[in-house]
Amino acid sequence: MFRRLLIATVVGILAAFAVAGFRHAMLLLEWLFLNNDSGSLVNAATNLSPWRRLLTPALGGLAAGLLLMGWQKFTQQRPHAPTDYMEALQTDGQFDYAASLVKSLASLLVVTSGSAIGREGAMILLAALAASCFAQCFTPRQEWKLWIACGAAAGMAAAYRAPLAGSLFIAEVLFGTMMLASLGPVIISAVVALLVSNLINHSDALLYSVQLSVTVLARDYALIISTGVLAGLCGPLLLTLMNACHRGFVSLKLAPPWQLALGGLIVGLLSLFTPAVWGNGYSTVQSFLTAPPLLMIIAGIFLCKLFAVLASSGSGAPGGVFTPTLFIGLAIGMLYGRSLGLWFPDGEEITLLLGLTGMATLLAATTHAPIMSTLMICEMTGEYQLLPGLLIACVIASVISRTLHRDSIYRQHTAKHS
């Protein structure tokens, strides 16, 4: 057991450096090509001329597509093993390392060029790859899946600063691929990754800064639960839209570079209306949490961002949809809160409260992982007083969503690529 905990510590350290490496590569490319050193793609888009804002996501998608197609032609074959950590956990615990690194590089290109796709997916993949490489060198074959799981959880902890949620992500989303008794090493890896990541970044700040001064009353619990019901209905709709957009792009029968370029061009067109559509949504989430906008502004940005996410994910842009889902949930919750706020004197606090609830419940509705979703929002924002209400709402959202749409976003993703 001590040996496993020691290896889990090493995996956590490797994962933290993998995530930091991807993050610094992003910052370097943004500085080189976008003349942006703020770390915010929304700021980068705001400072670009309209024609560059239009074309940059398309060019990034084109470059990523050419890279993926070029690699496939160079090797004369499709990847001989999984290039996704979920698939690796559900098979024999092995990766096609070269193809996985090329996929991560393609993700780096689309993410830094403004596509509305999550960067954290590539970060978690790189963390799992580092763990897998170490495991194949120093551990027996029957443990490889465990260390990939530890790497994925550690990558999630480093990316989102949420070690408990990262550990439960493995237990809930990938349930059945590992014994719950193995959660000890997973948690150790996640916590170590967070601590090392904090040292690298010289900061232990929360991912999102929120000033929520409300005391949760019986009325607030009712509003939180009703938001869970709303998210439970919206989650399956979002999954259906993503699936439909993917089928729509596939039906065009374009070569991968042109398909990704088309997705990027749609993002570029939408960014002419608002630069907030660029990137994974982190900057926009933080700005909404700092100062919730008016109803019509939320609605406008929400629609543009939703179409951008659908275009990016539908075109096959390599990356995650975890953070974009957080923004969509925040916007749905805030739209609901703004509508209800017309009838309450503390409308601003209700809007913020239901925005946070929307983040957790839509995440639960799309992942079918209510405990992970609850802890994720609490760890990212530090608002632990919301935990009881969020847990109830997330369970309700997950049950409704699972009833209406059998597959979670991750099972849908795995089925699509199998």
Curated annotation (Swiss-Prot):
It is a multi-pass membrane protein. GO terms for molecular function: voltage-gated chloride channel activity. InterPro entries: Cl-channel_core (IPR014743), Cl-channel_volt-gated_ClcB (IPR023790), ClC (IPR001807), ClC-type_chloride_channel (IPR050368). The chain crosses the membrane at residues 5-25, 54-74, 98-118, 120-140, 146-166, 178-200, 222-242, 258-278, 291-311, 316-336, 352-372, 380-400. Its main location: membrane. CDD domains: Voltage_gated_ClC. The keyword Ion transport applies. Belongs to the chloride channel (TC 2.A.49) family. ClcB subfamily. SUPFAM superfamilies: Clc chloride channel. Keywords: Cell inner membrane, Cell membrane, Chloride, Chloride channel, Ion channel, Ion transport, Membrane, Transmembrane, Transmembrane helix, Transport, Voltage-gated channel. It is found in: Cell inner membrane. It comes from Escherichia coli O7:K1 (strain IAI39 / ExPEC). Pfam families: Voltage_CLC. The keyword Transmembrane helix applies. GO terms for cellular component: chloride channel complex; plasma membrane. One of its GO terms (biological process) is response to acidic pH. This is Voltage-gated ClC-type chloride channel ClcB. Probably acts as an electrical shunt for an outwardly-directed proton pump that is linked to amino acid decarboxylation, as part of the extreme acid resistance (XAR) response.
